[in-house]
Amino acid sequence: MITYNTVKQIYGRNFGSMQIFKRDYFNQLLYTEGVMDFQKTLNAFWVVDNVISYMGAVIKTFKETEDTFFIVEIGVMQDKTGYMEVFHEGYVGNDYHDHLSVIYQKIPFIDLPTIVDEEITTYKFYLSLHNYEPLQFMLLLPSEY
């Protein structure tokens, strides 16, 4: 049975990648062995597909702000509803903000494990600029950064 302890094992056993992956249909997002491990172990291939669907907004934000680092967060409630959000840190005028949302999507059902007795369980991934030419971003687990 897959529990949140399985998730902790995934995050704990991935510290870097010897191999990089991408979807055949989208060259601007690469991802690490840790993200592949997350997808395979939790049968959560939809996570990368969702991030790909957000990449237009990420690239637009990158071009406007030159910010090269984003956080992808998935929040899962006990009733399995939740959200997926991409955000970054940065300045708006002269004011610094540690949470500038790029895109936020409510998701009616998320099949990821939750922490017992926690109202919401969050999963974090990092999305970092990998190449300028061609423009590519890398999705990775925090333990791989």
Q: How does the language model describe each region?
A:
Residues 1-110:
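N-terminal "domain-start" segment
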Residues 94-145:
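Short, compact, well-ordered microdomains
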